[in-house]
């Protein structure tokens, strides 16, 4: 989990639009971001396995 000060820093509007980048809403991780859900791959996997993301389930074939 990210520190409170880091979260506040990320939420501040950037001076230039180019400097904005995607971060996970839960943990603040910048890498492995899934744009459709606004989560990183790790948080997405956890929530999907718990069944907390509607319409998502583990693939089986």
From Swiss-Prot:
Q: Which domain of life is it from?
A: Bacteria
Q: Sorted alphabetically, which Pfam families does this protein's record hold?
A: Ribosomal_S14
- For whether the record's keyword set contains Hydrolase, the answer is no
Cofactor(s) needed by this chain: Zn(2+)
The cofactor remark states: Binds 1 zinc ion per subunit.
- What UniProt keywords apply to this chain's record, in alphabetical order? Metal-binding, Ribonucleoprotein, Ribosomal protein, RNA-binding, rRNA-binding, Zinc
Task: Please list the residues that bind Zn(2+).
Answer: 24, 27, 40, 43
Q: What GO biological process terms does the UniProt entry carry, in alphabetical order?
A: translation
Keyword RNA-binding in record: yes
| Gene Ontology molecular function, alphabetical | rRNA binding; structural constituent of ribosome; zinc ion binding
Cellular component terms (Gene Ontology):
cytoplasm; small ribosomal subunit
What's this chain's function? Binds 16S rRNA, required for the assembly of 30S particles and may also be responsible for determining the conformation of the 16S rRNA at the A site.
Q: How does it assemble?
A: Part of the 30S ribosomal subunit. Contacts proteins S3 and S10.
Q: Which family does it belong to?
A: Belongs to the universal ribosomal protein uS14 family. Zinc-binding uS14 subfamily.
Q: Which HAMAP family match?
A: Ribosomal_uS14_2_B
Q: State the protein's name.
A: Small ribosomal subunit protein uS14
